[in-house]
């Protein structure tokens, strides 16, 4: 995509969550392509151990089968109000008016008239590859662009990983980025772009 949109020119790149993690990896693998990078709550994943590989691969195989059977299909909703309710459940800070607006712009009726959120159910399937922190850090060290790492005041990692991966560990990893600036958005959760636009 970058080769099409900006051939030969470095770009400013912004990524949120998984997109922030992907942007960080890309910036270290292709440092000449990135001029500046903003990482919004793109934390990476908990460290893994080689002994986890057999179980992880078995889980991946089981989840691929479940995906093929349609057991992981994304939920659809009766109306845009249902989508708005789901958004507010995921983000308690989101008011009804903003949730209704987002629902209308994020989801759309499918062929059966049910409101569907764009996405790929395959994202529910666990990655068969273990996350290797040492590899991620080697990639971070190659990032030549200035990086702004933005986190929300609410501790998303604590909510998701229950101590398996902490904000302190994330900050320690980010210290491998040569040109790092960190910022914190107050009164915001993981969807900080909704909470404090």
Task: Walk through the language-model features, giving the residues of each.
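Conserved hydrolase catalytic core segment
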Residues: 4-55
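Short gly/ser/thr-rich secondary-structure transition/capping motifs
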Residues: 126-134, 163-165
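Glycosyltransferase donor-binding loop in the core domain
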Residues: 75, 189-192
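Serine-hydrolase catalytic core
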Residues: 97-98, 136-143
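Conserved alpha/beta-hydrolase catalytic His-Asp/Glu region
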Residues: 71-130
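Internal catalytic or translocation cores that form aromatic/hydrophobic pockets or channels
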Residues: 21, 40, 50-93
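Conserved loop-alpha-helix segment in the C-terminal half of the alpha/beta-hydrolase fold
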Residues: 142-188
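Post-His helix in hydrolase/transferase enzymes
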Residues: 178, 193-197
């Amino acid at each position: 995509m970058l080769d099409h949109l900006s051939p030969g020119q470095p770009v400013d790149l912004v990524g949120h969550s998984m997109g922030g993690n992907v942007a960080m990896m890309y910036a270290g693998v292709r440092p000449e392509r990135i001029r500046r990078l903003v990482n919004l709550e793109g934390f990476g994943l908990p460290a893994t151990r080689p002994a986890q590989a057999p179980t992880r691969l078995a889980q991946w195989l089981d989840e691929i089968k479940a995906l093929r059977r349609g057991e992981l299909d994304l939920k659809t909703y009766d109306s845009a109000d249902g989508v708005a309710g789901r958004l507010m459940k995921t983000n308690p800070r989101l008011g009804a008016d903003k949730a209704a607006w987002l629902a209308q712009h994020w989801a759309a009726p499918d062929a059966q008239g049910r409101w569907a959120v764009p996405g790929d159910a395959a994202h529910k399937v666990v990655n068969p590859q273990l996350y290797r922190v040492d590899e991620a850090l080697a990639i971070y060290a190659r990032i030549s662009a200035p990086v702004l790492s933005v986190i929300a005041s609410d501790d998303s990692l604590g909510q998701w990983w229950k101590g398996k991966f902490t904000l302190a560990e994330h900050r320690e990893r980010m210290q491998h980025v040569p040109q790092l600036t960190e910022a914190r958005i107050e009164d915001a959760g993981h969807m900080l772009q909704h909470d404090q636009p």
